[in-house]
Structure formats: structure tokens, C-alpha cells
Amino acid sequence: MGERVNRGGSDESFGRRYLDALIAVVEGTRERLPEITEAGEAVAERLVAGGDLFIASVRPDFVSEGIVRSGGLMMLRAYGPDTTLSPGDTVIFGWSNTAPGQDLALLGRLRESGAFVVGIGPAPPGENSGAFLAHVDAFLESAPPLPPLPPGVVERFGGEAYPLVSLQNLALLWAFTGEMVAALTRRGRMATMYQSVLVPGARERNARYRSHRFHEAHEVPPLPAGQVGGRYLEEIGGCLRALREEAPAIERVARACAEVRGRGNQVHAFLISHFPVYQWGAPGDPKFMQRLEVMSGETPPAAELEARMRPGDLFFFLGYYRRPAKAYEAVRRAGGLIAEVIAGTDAEPDGPTPDYVIRPRWPYRDSLTPVPGYDVKILPSSGIVQAAIYWAVVGTVAETAS
């Protein structure tokens, strides 16, 4: 579990207080490992029997985090309006209590199919809670840590718990994925898993396995219950603890954003795909930044950036590995500032040097958890960590403004 996080007085920066709360909910997830393992066992049995695996939510971020993801399952597919489910299938359904009526309606449709539903989210509010959970076969509950919370965290997000709950949902999703993979190894199967496509050679490696749910041959031994999911939670907790040391950099970036806005300029944000891109405008987001067009990959839309940037504006680049040299050059031509959040590679970055830097502290190649006998690590870190940085920055801007 590591050292206890500080939940004390408000002399800590907002970034540290928010990360303390997030570390606490991730650590709380470890207490659910027996339930996670049990759910993984049930789903593994269904997959071996030929059932398909889907992921569903009324929010696009939870689904996007799960599919075609570094360290994730190749067999996992997004559930949509045209999806036909059978009783042998499994659906991972995520919610965050931001749209309970829509959640219940979608969950009802999943239940009507007869598919096995793994629910990931906080306890539903109000009198419909019992009916809601009756539609779920396995419930992996997320919730903020019990009081005392670090002071002022939820308040900076307008009272919304989403910036904490949604990221605990991801910790549960990936711990569950790890325990399901381990349960499959105890049945002689190794699921095909993605490597980050931005690692050299990964696209070719992934293409060899993409049409297979399981490896035709593998050297992965049966893995004990609790090992893979538990290791992931340890590793992602370590990433967040390391990120906590970036709190001064987070505060510098947030103050720069506040100063830019205070003089009438804009903060233009490029947020990397999968989960982080959907945090702009999510429940609790004060929308202090203007988001650039949603795109895949690591390259901001240069034409849009050229059109938007004005002297004194700030470009907030929440990226993946690499520095977008051409985008930075466009910002400099416009007389703008640059704040950079990338993991980096072994190579020296190209392009202009940014004015502000936050080191996200998640590893190059993204995935955290080794599997004995497998060629790549599994279960990613970047979605949780990069989204946490976004929330830490905008929460600090909100505190500065108050």
C-alpha cells in the first residue's frame, strides 16, 4: 500500500490534495480484489465457452478507454445501438451517476438480452438503486474515499465527484481485465493484448494477432488469483504518487492559465484520445480551456491551431509520448505560450522548448503489468494519469480564481 497520503490541512496545493484523494480511491480498490477476481473467473468461463465481450456506457470516455487500447484486450468490442447480444455474451457496463435515468435505460436493454453484466460504478442514488443493481450480475463498486476528504477537492469541481469516481472506474476496469486474463491462463488460454501503436514495431506485432481472441500458442503459465490485478493497482498507485511530486509544476501551469484568462486571452487545449479527450466538458469541468478538434494520434490539427491562436494565448498540450514540433512552431509564430504534458521517449524531442512542463511520470510504452512468458506488459496507465493531470490543473485554476 505504501505510505499513507496526507488528508490533513488545506496548506497543501490543490494538485496535491486532489491527487491524495485519487490515490486514496485507488488504494481503496485493492480491498475489492476478491470481488474483482470472482467476476474475472465468471467472465473467463463464458469466454472459453465462446461468448463475446463488450463494453458499454452512456458516456463515450469509459468505452473509448477500453477498446483498441495499449495493454488492453483485442477481443473487447464497443456495444452500440446495432449490437446484437446473446445470453452467452458479457458486457462491462460503466457509470458515474451523472445521468442515472439514461444509465438505467441502457442497463435495462442489456439485461433484456440475457447477457452477463459486470457493473463498474458508484452505488446508484435514490429509490431506484435496488432496481438498478438487480440488472447487474457482478457489481464492482467505486466511490470516493470515506471522510475526511482532503479539503476543497470536490468543491472545486462544483460539488461533482466525477473527477474522482470516473478514474476509480478505470482502475477497476483494468484490475478486472487483469484478473480476467489471469483466470483465462488458469484455463490454458492467453488473451491477445495490444501493444501501444506508437511504439516502433507495435502495429506489425498487433496485426499478427488482431483476428484472434486467444494466442494459438503461448508460454504463459497459470497465474494465481489476485496477482495481475493487484500488481496493476500497485503500479498505477506508484504512478500517481510520483505525479504528486509534480504538484509545483501543476500549480505553475494552472497559474499561467489563470493569468492568460485574466488578461482576456484563451487557453487552447489538445487532449490525447481515448479517455482524456472526453474530460473537457465532463461533469465538474469549469471549461477554463477551449478544446481543439478531437483527433486520433498525437498531432494537433495545425490549421485549427493557426486560426485560433492569438498573441498571449496559451497552448496546453496533454499528449502521449512525442512533442508536436510543427504545432509548437505555429504557436510561437502566433506569439503564444506552451504548456507541455508528455511522457517522452528515449530520443531528444524536436521543436521549440515549451514554457511550462509537467512530467506525467507514466512509463514509455504505457502498460504497467508484466505477465510471465508474454512479450509485452499489459494494462495501461496513461488514461488515468493524463486525465488526473487535466483535473488537477483545472481544479487549481478554479481555486486560484476563487
Name the predicted role of every residue range:
Residues 1, 42, 48-186, 264, ...:
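Glycine-rich phosphate-binding loops that contact phosphosugars or nucleotide phosphates
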Residues 2-31, 211-244:
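Generic N-terminal amphipathic, Lys/Arg-enriched alpha-helix
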Residues 10, 35, 249, 297-301:
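Short secondary-structure boundary/capping elements
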Residues 14, 35-38, 58, 168, ...:
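Short, contiguous, pocket-lining structural segments
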Residues 24-25, 148, 157, 179-223, ...:
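Internal, active-site/partner-interface "lid" segment
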Residues 28-46, 242-261:
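A short, well-structured juxtamembrane/interface segment
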Residues 35-38, 53-57, 184-194, 246-253, ...:
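Flexible, glycine/charged-enriched surface loops at secondary-structure junctions
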